[in-house]
């Protein structure tokens, strides 16, 4: 297991996959490395389900932190092509957190859930000794819809186009410059530009827009491991290859300056909010047009091929063993 971040594929295959409880016929897609959600068949309906830790970052302001935390959770089911619909959430709060602080967090969660049509159906909230920010709980999101509308995470097919929104290190850039503005060597204008990237660190609405616009075959939120990690995870899960042209990938303002200042590789740094999609070429323009109308920065960056592995500018890449942002966060904290 890695010292920081999610477990790797080898650890999962050795310790987790052999012990998944009872086998049930209604589990259509169970736990799989690099796959954002599980899938249940309930009668004639499909249920996408995903669980994530809840991270509350007080320097963001508690209401904004609540919205940010919820978006991270909902993204994992939004990439199923089904709109997020239900939420179970648990808070294990530090004793130092005041009632007013929690009320602000909850207002952020409520407002974002209401805007996205998500209903909170159950949960648990308490203060406990030993709990501390930012990791203060966990949440499970569900998306319920027609089975025919599900976009499987392993659905990429040879001949599909590969699309990317936002590009590398959007979350890393926005988060680190917001949390540690005085410790990063950027001028005021560049710092403000970089901090604005945090508002783009959610792919929920982009995923819903793309799914409604055209024949999307797979979607993935580029979280830990960044874009390189996301490319490898998608290709591996589908048993296909990706050929990527780096120059076509959009790069948002402030990203390169921030990553240069921190000495990190933007392509392997966490990029929540950057959506990787594979699309039937007949629908690529429709998907790009819909994303553009929503104000998203998106581009066709490559294609899906027969075979295995990912190449970027004709050079083979592997999934990063450690997210590039972790060391920077540790150094700045």
Predicted segments, located by residue:
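Glycine-rich anion-binding loops of enzyme active sites
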Residues: 58, 86-176
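Extreme N-terminal cap/leader segments of soluble proteins
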Residues: 1-59, 110-113, 117-118, 329-333
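Small-aliphatic-rich amphipathic alpha-helix that forms the alpha element of a beta-alpha
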Residues: 62-87, 107-115, 203-209, 229-233
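Acidic, Ser/Thr/Pro-rich beta/coil linker or hinge segments at domain junctions
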Residues: 3, 291-333
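Short, acidic (Asp/Glu-rich) active-site segment that either coordinates a divalent metal cofactor
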Residues: 152-208
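General beta-strand structural signal in soluble alpha/beta enzymes
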Residues: 29-32, 48-50, 120-124, 164-166, ...
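Helix N-cap motif at beta-to-alpha junctions
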Residues: 279-284
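Active-site-proximal betaalpha loop/short-helix elements
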Residues: 96, 196-271
